[in-house]
Amino acid sequence: MSQLDKIAQQGKLSLGLVFPIEAYSGSVAKMENQEKLAKRAEELGFKALWFRDVPFNDPSFGDAGQLYDPWVYMTHIMNHTETIALATGSIILPLRHPVHTAKSLFSLQELSKGRIILGLASGDRPSEYPAFDRDLGQKSDLFRDSFSYLKALHSDFPVHRSSFYGSLNGQIDLLPKHRYATPMLVTGHSGQSLNWIAENSDGWIYYPRDFRFLEQTMQNWRQALAQTDQEWKPYIQSLYIDLLESKAAHPAPIHLGFKGGSDYTLAHLKLLESHGVNHVIINLKYGSRPAEEVLEELGKSILPHFV
């Protein structure tokens, strides 16, 4: 059983957290007590911790993520936790050579004894592409090409020819060898058709939308799986939450999420579950309370209702 099987089950919903696990204004988080919060999240029953790939701080974008390189920081958090899944949300494939991505992935998958889930994306910050001498207009092709290369590297002494990243002639092999299955998820559309995502990935990560839009999105996802002769694959989404102190507090929208009490939060998550969402990545950036308090309340009032 892969980590994806543990966090995403058909007809059920689980919860994860994305770093930074804190509320912060502006682009740059303080990144304080993250190790303690990660360990507490594991103890409370969150199923995954998510790490972002943000090479540069673009002030116009407004969020620099967890600041540290995702592979380095994942290794750090791995050493402060025991079993919780560690997921990238998401590695920007066009900006990294697939060999380097695979080397980091295989190394950490082995060292963590199979705790890694690989979320992949084409990137949503155009300002980063010139710094890597990448053509933004080719990002869809770059993503697809890198994805194929990365899959090829899972084979022994692989043979593969890439249009952008080089070729493999079967004479060299990438170590360490991987003993654990690594789920590969696509974030957003990454410039690909939904049928391509359904056929080639192990699941789809998308963004929070209103329930009418979500219903159509889920219908499109199931249709894409059917059209490509695929069995069920999980649907994962992010969600910004400002959990207010009063459990009965009325909800109000915030960017890509809501603020409200635990009563509304539970009802909202249950509705997501009924629509077929399998895992929700909670982001606390816009919170009004200390993350420690929010984690404890989520652990007491929300987590017992989900897998």
Language-model segments: what does each one mean?
Residues 10, 14-29, 94-160, 212, ...:
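Flexible, glycine-rich active-site loops centered on histidine and acidic residues
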Residues 28-41, 104, 186-196, 260-272:
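Short, acidic/polar
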Residues 15-19, 49-51, 86-88, 116-120, ...:
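Hydrophobic faces of well-ordered beta-strands that scaffold small-molecule active sites
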Residues 1-80, 182, 285-288, 297, ...:
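N-terminal beta1-alpha1-beta2 module of alpha/beta enzyme domains
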Residues 45, 53, 77, 108, ...:
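Conserved, mostly hydrophobic/aromatic
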Residues 5-9, 42-43, 74-82, 105, ...:
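Acidic (Asp/Glu)-rich catalytic clusters
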Residues 1-11, 132, 137-178, 207-307:
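An alpha-helical appendage that flanks or caps ligand/catalytic pockets
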Residues 19-31, 91-99, 180-189, 250-263:
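Active-site mouth loops of central-metabolism enzymes
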